[in-house]
Amino acid sequence: METMTSKAGEERRSVTAPSQPYDPAYDPLKSTTPGQGRDYAPTYWIGTAGEPPADDGPVTQDMDVDVVIIGAGFTGLTTAIFLAQEYGIRATVLEANRTSWGCSTRNGGQAQCASGRLKRSQWIERYGLDTALKLHAECVEGMETFKSLIKDIDCDPQPGGHLYIAHRDKVMPVLEKEARLLRDVFDYDAQILDGDTVKRDWVGDQEAAGAMHEPEGIGIHAGKLAFGYLRKARALGARVHPSSPVQGWETRDGVHYLKTPGGTVRARAVGIATGGYTSQSLHPQLKNRLLPILSNSIVTRPLTANEIEACSFRTHQVITDTRVLRHYYRLLPDNRLQIGSRSAITGRDAPQQKYEDVLVNNMVRKFPALKGIPLDYSWWGWVDVSHDMMPRIHQPDPSETIFYALGYGGNGVMYSAQAGRRLAQWIAGDGRQLDLPIFTSKLPFPNIREMVESQAFAPFRRFGQRFLYRWYYLKDEVL
């Protein structure tokens, strides 16, 4: 345990130091647990966020609490915040490694008005118009929840919207149709830009055939946001225990016995907020219900004024392209370029240099002036994707006080705030009024074209993923 003086020098505070190094090959489908006390991944967010805030240290004895949240990332910490603010419940948050060690400090820092991986038109196809409109309202409300949470957190916000770039001419008719739908049906002011306008007034992405601009979208510093959530949760009375993985779980007479290395925590209710780092063994309700997918990210050294001009960067807004295996990127406040996309399929393969090389080549394809630019940061992380591409904030068994918020599919920076509010609502006994499919149904098992769902398909998930990646590449680049 490290102890240090606060900036004001008026009080002592403790930050739990790592006891194990970062594991670059960690794989949630192969590893029994995410480890204990592991250090952060070497991300830009961690490298520039400053010293982590104080925490409550590892669990060191048996204890009785009302509510346990498993996972101290964006979702777990916002759940603790809303439990305290809206219900007067002081949660105990258990984290296996360092606080916000997983998804929350390995993402691209893009807060978009979305969750899951489906477009609004796909919502209509799956759920019907009425439910699609309600899902959109949930995302719009979620963006307001997010804005309210971050207004007093110094997380380098870059507001202004989201630029969705068509990477090929053939994509433009589809993008134009989606924009009309957003305007006419969802009353959401999405505007179409032609390729020349994008390159002249927004960004000189050489692939841009046009773009759709959405009014909602904020770039944030993920590390500063995570640390801000931690400070806020603890100020409201939550206790946050890093280096305290749940290594065993029994439920007897309505009480959950959560075994950690330092003691057993007994709780009346448990919320699960473990994201892409959910181990298969955590609880039977979660086994085989997520497909963790790796995403790579790189950050360059700060661009010079000449490089910024050569790339025609006129915006700091968040940007993605229309590939199925999409790229997400933006110019950061310190004028570095951050860009991310798909990575390896297994944790064992993730450290291979070829995945960084592919991302660098794709960056140069978009911005030829950046060929040879040094990278200051390179990392990868696991994204929690559900088998139907939509999140769930749900109580899987009405007879058990177990709840989860999972499956954001790479759109969790914003929606984790709303999911935290909804998870708190469930835990506090107020969740029965939530009637959208993401609240009323379990995370599904693997399926074949959403027609046949079965846990028996689970061993073949990564075989299917390899096939889909090849198909998506052909769809994105060739066909």
Model-found features: residue ranges?
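Short beta-strand to alpha-helix junction loop
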Residues: 134-143, 165-175, 212-232, 241, ...
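C-terminal catalytic lobe of FAD-dependent flavoproteins
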Residues: 7-8, 12-14, 345-471, 475
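Dinucleotide-binding Rossmann-like beta1-alpha1 core, especially the glycine-rich loop
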Residues: 114-197
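Active-site substrate-recognition segment that forms the wall
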Residues: 109, 144, 152-159, 246, ...
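N-terminal Rossmann-like FAD-binding beta1-loop-alpha1 element of flavoenzymes
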Residues: 65-93
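Extreme N-terminal leader/targeting segments of oxidoreductases
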Residues: 1-67, 85-86
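Helical element adjacent to the flavin cofactor pocket in flavoenzyme catalytic cores
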Residues: 181-183, 206-268
